[in-house]
């Protein structure tokens, strides 16, 4: 095997196990330099070493030599390269981006890191960066904390941003038999805050994560500062003809039902039409990584079932409860969203006259499809809170 380039040797030489969340005793990361070669890095026994490429790696990182040199100098260049498509991270964002964070050479408080938190109910995988008022980011159905990489990069200069894999998804536990409804997820969120010793946080939620953020705020208003809800999944107001059938259908059927990758790719393209191809490919990888496990499929179907079955009206109905929401809220809607039509904004405005609204030309994942506009709005909104720090220029505005 030819010697690894100096920039790869620099990265490996800086490896810091304390910020690398290895879920296995032996982790293999493949580093590909376009038109120049491939090298594997194996993390085992607390150290990282360059070895001959072999077998199936846990993550594959691909970039040209100039991009790798930039990453070796400054991790933020790696995040910029990933967002722009110059760096590809495939198979496992948790491992791939976690490796970059562990080889950045950064030592200051608030640097990007990945870790697993043992809560009272489950082990939850988180990605966090920054110092300041805490912001908890909750991903959507079938997603992972990786969908908030742009958010972490954009807001970490002013906030401590924590993105979590919800139970049932990503690298978090996937308990068989859990209800995976809004109440269950809200309880998991509070368990995480308790484990992190956080009394109060701002919440940012996308899709299912938006619904969970609302549930946390409705049940525990004293634990929530402000709410930023990105295309949140809300209870359907109109007739739902499939309700009787879905009530009879058990989510455990997901234990045996698979989905081919081409089908998943087509769905992801429709859901996030404004995303770069690299993001779409990574999103498909992240979805399939959990979905291809029986417990992950069961969690997905259970959560999807509860979104559709949630009672919209009546004393305990969602829209009745929504009127009692206390924290200030910002709703971000996508004009091309096929899952949560923008017509929901009118119903939210009726229930919450003081809530703010932003419409963007995107689909269902604004933080990925329209990162500059989304994060500018989030930074401005969250900075109005009494405990927010002064406003430096964000990286995305430079």
Can you name each region flagged by the protein language model?
Residues 1-115, 146:
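Feature captures hydrophobic
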Residues 218, 225-258:
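Flexible "cap/lid" loop of the alpha/beta hydrolase fold
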Residues 259-323:
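Conserved alpha/beta-hydrolase catalytic His-Asp/Glu region
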Residues 163-204, 208, 376:
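Active-site loop/oxyanion-hole signature of alpha/beta-hydrolase fold enzymes
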Residues 122-171:
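Conserved HGGG/HGGXW glycine-rich cap/lid loop of the alpha/beta-hydrolase fold
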Residues 94, 98-135, 158-159, 198-199, ...:
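Alpha/beta-hydrolase fold catalytic core
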Residues 354-398:
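Catalytic active-site module of serine/aspartate enzymes centered on a nucleophile-bearing elbow/loop
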Residues 325, 331-333:
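Short beta-strand/loop motif that positions the catalytic acidic residue
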């Amino acid at each position: 095997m030819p010697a690894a380039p100096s920039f790869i040797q620099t990265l490996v030489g800086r490896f810091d196990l304390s910020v690398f969340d290895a879920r296995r005793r032996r982790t293999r990361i493949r580093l590909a330099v376009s038109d120049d070669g491939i090298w594997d890095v194996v993390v085992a026994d607390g150290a990282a070493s360059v070895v001959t490429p072999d077998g199936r790696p846990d993550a594959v990182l691909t970039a040209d030599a100039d991009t790798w040199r930039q990453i070796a100098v400054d991790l933020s260049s790696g995040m910029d390269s990933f967002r722009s498509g110059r760096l590809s991270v495939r198979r496992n964002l948790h491992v791939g981006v976690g490796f970059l964070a562990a080889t950045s050479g950064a030592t200051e408080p608030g640097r990007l890191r990945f870790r697993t938190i043992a809560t009272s109910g489950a082990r939850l995988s988180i990605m966090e960066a920054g110092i300041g008022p805490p912001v908890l980011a909750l991903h959507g159905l079938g997603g992972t904390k990786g969908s908030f990489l742009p958010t972490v990069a954009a807001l970490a200069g002013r906030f401590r941003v924590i993105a979590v894999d919800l139970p049932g998804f990503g690298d978090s536990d996937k308990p068989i038999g859990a209800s995976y409804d809004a109440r269950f997820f809200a309880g998991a969120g509070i368990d995480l805050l308790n484990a992190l010793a956080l009394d109060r946080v701002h919440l940012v939620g996308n899709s299912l994560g938006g619904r969970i953020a609302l549930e946390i705020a409705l049940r525990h208003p004293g634990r929530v500062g402000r709410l930023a809800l990105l295309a949140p999944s809300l209870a359907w107001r109109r007739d739902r003809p499939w309700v009787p059938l879905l009530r009879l259908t058990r989510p455990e059927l997901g234990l045996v039902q698979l989905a081919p990758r081409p089908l998943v790719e087509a769905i992801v393209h429709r859901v996030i039409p404004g995303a770069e191809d690299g993001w779409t490919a990574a999103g498909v990888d992240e979805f399939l990584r959990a979905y291809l496990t029986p417990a992950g499929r069961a969690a997905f179907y259970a959560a999807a079932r509860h979104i559709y079955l949630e009672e919209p009206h009546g004393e305990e109905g969602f829209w009745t409860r929504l009127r009692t929401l206390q924290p200030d809220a910002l709703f971000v809607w996508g004009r091309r969203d096929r899952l949560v039509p923008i017509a929901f904004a009118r119903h939210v405005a009726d229930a919450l006259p003081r809530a703010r609204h932003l419409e963007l030309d995107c689909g269902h994942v604004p933080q990925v499809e329209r990162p500059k506009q989304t994060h500018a709005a989030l930074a401005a909104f969250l900075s109005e809170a009494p405990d927010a720090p002064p406003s430096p220029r964000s990286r995305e505005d430079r």
